[in-house]
Amino acid sequence: MKLQYLVALLFVQAVPPVTAGYIHQYALAGSAIRQPIDQKTQREDLNKLVSDSPLLSLHRTICEIESVSNHEGAVGEMLIKYLRDHDFTVEKQIVPADRGTNSTAERFNIWAYPKGFPRPKIILTSHIDTVPPHIKYSLHAPDGDFDRAKVRIMGRGTVDAKASVAAQIIAALKHLKSNKDIPLGLLFVVSEEVGGSGMVHFSNSELNTNPPFFHTLIFGEPTDLTLVDGHKGNLRVTIHAKGVAAHSGYPWLGHSAISEILPILARMDELGDIPVETGGLPSSEKYGRTTVNIGTIKGGAADNVVPETASASISVRLAAGTPEEAEEVIRRAVNDVSGGSTNITVNFPDSMPYPPIDLDVDVEGFDISTVNYGTDIPKLEIHDEELEVKVKRYLYGPGTIFVAHGAEEGITVGDLEKAVEGYSKLIDAAVERDWPREVVVN
């Protein structure tokens, strides 16, 4: 055995098992051997990867800025500067703080369009708020052989929905670079995560004309790069029970509100599994079962006191029918269980419940899916009732909803870059679409 081969063999045997953190590869004696790099070098390599990409660097910048709902002002200001630096005309839509919050900070929707096109026909839109808490942006190399596309970006908003925001902007810039006359607009709204007041504000504004000046809306949410043909409807329910407080040693002297509400909640929990014919909530082939989630239960003062009050909040994801029909089913179910007790009160606090939302999927080259989560799509009223050709609504975006809102929220570089291609494809289809009318906006 040649001496140099023996040395190489001994070196290979001494190398520790492959772990994350090995990016560079070198050849020795015909064998590929990974050489470890220290964390500082790896961090510098990953940061350079991001800094060299307009998409990744924009995504990093907006994700590093905390923008929990009702505190979106800082990220909004950053986006306004970025868009103006790239020759967009940008308008602020000041949105008041949501009811019940203590925030006094200014926050706003962002309405942007190429100079000279204040009424764009194609609008890309997403939201700039996130759920709490803010989680710091971080980069993570893949295990095993280094693959740029598998580098993982983690932190709050990296998926929901700042990935869509960044990809939509870069896709728009790409198209405007090749054709500055493409009528593209950008709408980024606040408070999607807490009721959709940002989109409601836009919907009620003079920008939402009748008839609409736009013919295509492209909404950005995490869809795993699939084109979504619809999502379930939504209805919120609160149930309150009233009792009489007493010493727990003498419970017959009082009346337990918790005992009153428990059988009602048990019935609510199964309404999605009961056939409509026997009092259940509807299902559909497209969306499956209507689902009921009892999200919070509150009640009682102490374990040695008969509880005087109890309440529960419930989210219903509708697979079919209307919110009004679902409300009737729920009222009947509560009445059946409680025997019409006046101690029970049912409320439907959402001012804008909505049925299942069907969306457009007529662009080729995408996998198709349905989703169970809600969006602010139904919060935008489109005044196309009198039009022969209706406004197209698409829902598409990078990342998976399964990690959104969680401690492990994150997305790969590959998925983020593919999203630019996907949005570009949707823009191309919108540009090519025949729009057989001239819209006159007063």
UniProtKB/Swiss-Prot annotation:
Q: How is the cofactor bound?
A: Binds 2 Zn(2+) ions per subunit.
Residue numbers binding Zn(2+) 2:
D160
Necessary cofactors = Zn(2+)
* EC number per UniProt: 3.4.17.-
Supply the Pfam families for this chain: M20_dimer, Peptidase_M20
* Annotated keywords: Glycoprotein, Hydrolase, Metal-binding, Protease, Secreted, Signal, Zinc
Q: Which residues cross the membrane?
A: none
Q: Which domain of life is it from?
A: Eukaryota
Which CDD domains does the record match to this protein? M20_ArgE_DapE-like_fungal (cd05652)
Q: What class of enzyme is it?
A: hydrolase
Annotated GO molecular function terms are: metal ion binding; peptidase activity
Listed GO biological process terms: proteolysis
Residues annotated as glycosylated are N102, N343
Q: Does the keyword Metal-binding apply?
A: yes
The residue range of the signal peptide is 1-20
By its UniProt entry, which Gene3D superfamilies does this protein fall under? 3.30.70.360, Zn peptidases (3.40.630.10)
* Catalytic residues of the enzyme: E192 (proton acceptor)
Q: Which family does it belong to?
A: Belongs to the peptidase M20A family.
- The name on file for this protein is Probable carboxypeptidase PAAG_00768
Phylogenetic lineage:
Eukaryota, Fungi, Dikarya, Ascomycota, Pezizomycotina
